[in-house]
Each structure stands twice: as C-alpha cells, then as structure tokens.
Amino acid sequence: ASILTNAS
C-alpha cells in the first residue's frame, strides 16, 4: 500500500 499526501 502507498499513501501520498500533499498540501500547500
């Protein structure tokens, strides 16, 4: 499983 989170 892979999780990508990005907030800018």
Swiss-Prot record:
One Gene Ontology biological process: killing of cells of another organism
Any single Gene Ontology cellular-component annotation: extracellular region
UniProt keyword annotation of Secreted present: yes
Keywords: Antibiotic, Antimicrobial, Bacteriocin, Secreted
Top-level taxon of the source organism: Bacteria
Keyword Secreted: yes
Protein localization: Secreted
Function comment: Narrow spectrum bacteriocin, active against closely related bacterial species.
Protein name per UniProt: Bacteriocin
Naturally occurring in which organism (per UniProt): Rhizobium leguminosarum bv. viciae
